[in-house]
């Protein structure tokens, strides 16, 4: 494997605002030894997020739906619809939340949808999935595959026109689904075709599946031992609870066996103080090398999903501004049809 030249000292230089917060409120990640502790800490953090969730705009409706899966289970979905935009002019994005495949997070990105839906006339479908350790590999991936195919088959019923844009987005474990599903959609020739991908802090490798020489190139795993939110040790806890099949491309999409050619344009948002930083950057490089269009932003000195866990940071405003710019960029690649 060629040397990956993507480590920058600025990435892990702690954001000044965050440094002051951590002096008063230490992250506590070093004390996490099991998934139950992680879930408890996660719930406490989300109480802060709940106070910052934007109100629902007047021109956006929200509908809760149930999506069927292969084993007969129905999983939750929430549809954000721009009611003032005619259905024929609406694009659609399917979005998968962060979780480490183990933690609840389906409402984490509601504020994002409340911004994108009215601004861009985009129907946003936020999809849940079953979690480990209660449901082990490959249940979460199967839920993602089944829900994506269901949405693809029901876009018009969901009030959107795929010719205006059909997008996949996700954060962390949800970002993993974005990569996996885009390859499946390409290889299986799923219609309508995807027009854009949005990768937020994606998990794209299983360290245990890589040889030492390759793993050594992902320096972010060494540089984030004391990071807030997630550390390499916490990533180990997630994998131990989800128990993926060794070498599965579903958890190692960076090395997807059918390669990365002919994928839609990809927008990346990665965090500098995050174990997953380097795999996100490496994946962006791999997509670009395969001839795909990409755009990458790295937020220096902040941890994984900082906009969820540290919503008081002023950098969160930039995250939303970048999200708007990034989605505008994805929309710009959609082939225009006559109005």
Curated annotation (Swiss-Prot):
Its EC number is 3.-.-.-. It is an enzyme of class 3 (hydrolase). The keyword Hydrolase applies. Keywords: Hydrolase. One of its GO terms (biological process) is lipid catabolic process. One of its GO terms (molecular function) is hydrolase activity. It comes from the Eukaryota. The keyword ATP-binding does not apply. InterPro entries: AB_hydrolase_3, AB_hydrolase_fold, GDXG_lipolytic_enzyme. Belongs to the AB hydrolase superfamily. This is AB hydrolase superfamily protein B1A11.02. It comes from Schizosaccharomyces pombe (strain 972 / ATCC 24843).
